[in-house]
Swiss-Prot record:
GO terms for molecular function: flavin adenine dinucleotide binding; tRNA (uracil(54)-C5)-methyltransferase activity, 5,10-methylenetetrahydrofolate-dependent. Its EC number is 2.1.1.74. Pfam families: GIDA (PF01134). This is Methylenetetrahydrofolate--tRNA-(uracil-5-)-methyltransferase TrmFO. One of its GO terms (biological process) is tRNA wobble uridine modification. The gene is trmFO. It comes from Thermosynechococcus vestitus (strain NIES-2133 / IAM M-273 / BP-1).
Length: 457
């Protein structure tokens, strides 16, 4: 049988290659390091953790923790290895990064069905089953080839994403639903500022601390010229925002009947109205600063952020246009994608993408139908989101409870709601796996800590 090709030896590619070999099929894993250097990597190991050593919260009533549990049940190599190399980190799953990557490298290099080739693939293979898992720093040559394959508008090279907040955390006594001049459907939540509120917000925004750029981002400042951070707009003058993204024209505050001094608008991100995007708030502020400053917006005092604003180098596909929820390309079903290049964020999401793409690559090789995970699971919700989101405004998304379908019976208390999401996800995963004849590993669930959840810990 012709080997399956996996391009990229990060978390997603490593997981994908393992799942293919686990299915008893030969796989060739291409990793360009150390022959071709990456601006962010420091070793030649597979699955090197280039940023934090943390896989996020461990508790099953947190979004990332639920994804950990799902992947443990599904037999993820990445999560199993992370569990073996844990270091103390409070409620987070953090690892000894050197031992973690070294074990994964040795595991794949010593597997009889895995061939690791240390060379760059400048072009997508024209035939065979292929998993693309090249990550946010895809090489220039392969990026150019991907642009030719997908079309110039369907591959991005940097994130310029605004924060997203949970709809239930927005104060609807202050924020009001309307469109400018009442044209068409009332599509935006509008947060009205008084002159005093705007002045305080503008001052805090100008003084807020920005996240430092990495060396390779600083050297390529053109990535940021097309989409100026909101804090840079603010520094151009006190009225720049008020005549730009915070302009109040065409809107009236229903509490006063008057036009506000300024207005911050939020646009619905999902069909259920659970997630709302701060329009025009692409930012490079530190995450703690974003929460502090953006909670000064009237109506967002208690806002729960599920994605922070980012601006950084990141190669990713316009997944809603290109990918199915099975992670297959719509126009070439034998080509699959996994990891950050699909528009998911975080180590655990990358492992989940590697699991699904690798599993489906093996199924395609055996003539079986590809899998689509239930959208009520965290993994399934992620892949459903990236394959169905609005393509014109698509930006990468981390695991969060806001992308899950609403519960049949609404639960007001956050801790109980998250626990209900978890219970439904794991139940539906078990039912689905049984129907698909997939073995699941037994899970030992941790307890839910309502106080920690309500506090946002």
């Amino acid at each position: 049988m012709e080997p399956i090709t996996v391009i990229g030896g990060g978390l997603a590619g490593t997981e994908a290659a393992w799942q293919i070999a686990r299915a008893g099929l030969p796989v060739v894993l291409y990793e360009m390091r150390p022959q071709v250097a990456s601006p962010a990597h420091h070793t030649a190991e597979l699955a090197e953790l280039v940023c934090s050593n943390s896989f996020g919260a461990k508790a099953s009533d947190r979004a990332t923790g639920l994804l950990h549990h799902e992947l443990r049940a599904l037999g993820s190599l990445i999560i199993a290895t992370a569990d073996r190399h844990q270091v103390p980190a409070g409620g987070a799953l953090a690892v000894d990064r050197a031992h973690f990557s070294r074990e994964l490298t040795e595991t794949l290099e010593n597997h009889p069905l895995v061939t690791v080739r240390r060379e760059e693939l400048p072009h997508l293979p024209e035939s065979g089953i292929v998993v693309l898992a090249t990550g946010p720093l895809t090489s220039e040559a392969l990026s150019a080839d991907l642009q030719c394959f997908t079309g110039l508008d369907y591959l991005s090279f940097f994130d310029a994403a605004s924060p997203i907040v949970v709809g239930e955390s927005i104060n609807r006594e202050v924020a009001f639903l309307a469109s400018r001049y009442d044209r068409g459907e009332a599509a935006y939540l509008n947060c009205p500022f008084s002159a005093e509120e705007y002045q305080r917000f503008w001052q805090a925004l100008c003084e807020a601390k920005q996240a430092p750029l990495k060396d390779f981002e600083r050297e390529n400042a053109q990535f940021f010229e097309a989409c100026l951070p909101v804090e840079e707009l603010a520094r151009r003058g006190v009225d720049t925002l008020r005549f730009g993204p915070l302009k109040p024209v065409g809107l009236r505050d229903p509490r006063t009947g008057e036009r506000p001094y300024a207005v911050a608008q939020l646009r619905q991100e999902d069909r259920h109205g659970q997630l709302w995007n701060l329009v025009g708030f692409q930012t490079n502020l530190r995450w703690g600063e974003q929460q502090r400053v953006f909670r000064m917006i009237p109506g967002l005092e208690q806002a729960e952020f599920v994605r922070m604003g980012v601006m950084h180098r990141n190669t990713f596909l316009n997944a809603p246009k290109l990918l199915k929820a099975s992670l297959q390309f719509r126009d070439r079903p034998t080509l699959l994608a996994a990891g950050q290049i699909t528009g998911t964020e975080g180590y655990t999401a990358a492992a989940a993408g590697g699991w699904l793409a690798g599993t489906n690559a093996a199924r395609l090789a055996r003539g079986l139908a590809p899998l689509v995970l239930p959208p009520t699971t965290m993994a399934g919700a992620l892949f459903h989101y990236i394959s169905t989101a609005e393509s014109k405004t698509f930006q990468p998304m981390p695991p969060n409870f806001g992308i899950l379908p609403p519960l049949e019976q609404p639960v007001r208390q956050k801790a109980l709601r998250y626990a209900a999401y978890r219970d439904r996800a794991l139940k539906d995963l078990s039912t689905w796996a049984t129907a698909m004849s997939l073995p699941l590993q037994p899970l030992a669930l941790d307890g839910c800590d309502p106080a920690a959840v309500e506090a946002g810990a």
